[in-house]
């Protein structure tokens, strides 16, 4: 089954990408995988504090996922999958695509300012020399 991979964050672009992925997956018999990434800046503190911050970040991602999962189940009849990774965003996106062969499309929201494709798209394309392992859909 082909999965649409969406990167979770707090931006309006994420919501647009998620909505698009849910509709496309529903219409094509696919699935949606939501990737939450805990950035290195969130847990590079003293050991005890860093662990507490990591746990809080994971809980925050899981709480957001529950909201989006409920919406997706009610609107599109899909149950999305949550994956949580730790590290630099572009690196973790590429690692997830490589580790999950069912990921067929990366869905990202466009930069709302209209000034370039956005930081994650720029990082991914720059790192891969313009060649990504899966097609990318950028949702306006």
Sequence positions of predicted segments:
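Small/aliphatic-rich secondary-structure junction motif
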Residues: 2-48
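Generic structural signal for helix capping and beta-alpha/helix-loop junctions
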Residues: 41-42, 90, 115
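Structural beta-alpha unit
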Residues: 73-106
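A short acidic, glycine-rich active-site loop
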Residues: 51-63
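Gly/Ser-rich helix-loop-strand patches that form or flank binding pockets
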Residues: 97-140
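Short, hinge-like loop/turn segments at secondary-structure boundaries
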Residues: 49-53, 98-101
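General small-molecule cofactor/ligand-binding pocket signal
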Residues: 33-35, 81-85, 137-139
